[in-house]
Amino acid sequence: MNTFIKIILTALLVLIASFPYFQNGQAPGGLSELQYMGIIPSIILVVGFFTAIAFYCYTLQKVLQNVKPDNRTRKPKSIWFMYLIPFNFIEDFFIVIDVSNSLKNEMKTNKNLTKFGDFGLTLGIGWSVAQLFSFIPNIAGQISGLIGIILWIIHWVLLHRINKVLQQPTPNK
């Protein structure tokens, strides 16, 4: 059922995101900025972005690997679903929620984690929502994309800090 919902939401997103391209005239889309940069800088930017995503996924995978298996709500390798475009735009929400829930479960036996609040859930949902709004074909989409990248980086840094704490010995109860 969960997969069915994800597929329906992904199809809806693709329909909404492609709508401006079927209108008369050329509507500036989410990637229209790349045409102004030229081919080589655009390729470098895209490769750099996907490389950053790989490091982010690796960080999330390590976080889940450092969570006791009984406390995980997702398998560590499933983090790499972030590369399944366009499915990832919906899956990102589920990944962020599952990582946060796994950390909440882990906190019950690892009191070192109590200082991390919602374990980045708000940041993760924030960057995921901003990522969706970045499909708006105007300045609002561009601003949303920038906000999404900023929230994503802050989320990444937080999870890196959490990962360091997970690698420390657990204090006695």
Can you say where each PLM-predicted feature lies in the sequence?
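Membrane-interface extramembranous regions at the lipid-water interface
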Residues: 1-39, 44, 48-83, 87-132, ...
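Extracellular/periplasmic helix-loop-helix junctions in multi-pass membrane proteins
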Residues: 132-149
